[in-house]
């Protein structure tokens, strides 16, 4: 006997798609202390940003690195990040822990990154001694409270 189901399933491909990408974002933004100790804070930060769709420019380099193969290899203190650029990147507040230990970061450009919130801006205080410029463009989750953190930079 054949039974035909007349009810629609509650399964939505769109919901599954979002859950899948949210799960990846959690993994991609996770701070790995052991990895930072192995390769140094600058390379670990560069790997995080590239993995999430951002790019970095190293001190005394003219171009941005936006792919793993363009991140320079070498001693952990040899290549220092000078500029971060994230446009439509999937970076989250948790990933901003990668800023810890960056001593030469001068500029941060964040644009249309939907998952950046006020606490992300608060974590920028880790680089306040070297930071000269921060550009925040079209960040929907940043409120006046988040902007207030900039006063401390």
Regions found by a protein language model. Give the residues of each.
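N-terminal mitochondrial targeting presequence
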Residues: 1-32
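Leucine-rich repeat domain C-terminal region
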Residues: 13-14, 131-132, 140
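LRR N-terminal entry segment and analogous cap-like coil->beta motifs
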Residues: 21-37, 43-127, 132, 136-137
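Short, intrinsically disordered, charge-balanced linker/junction segments flanking boundaries
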Residues: 147-153
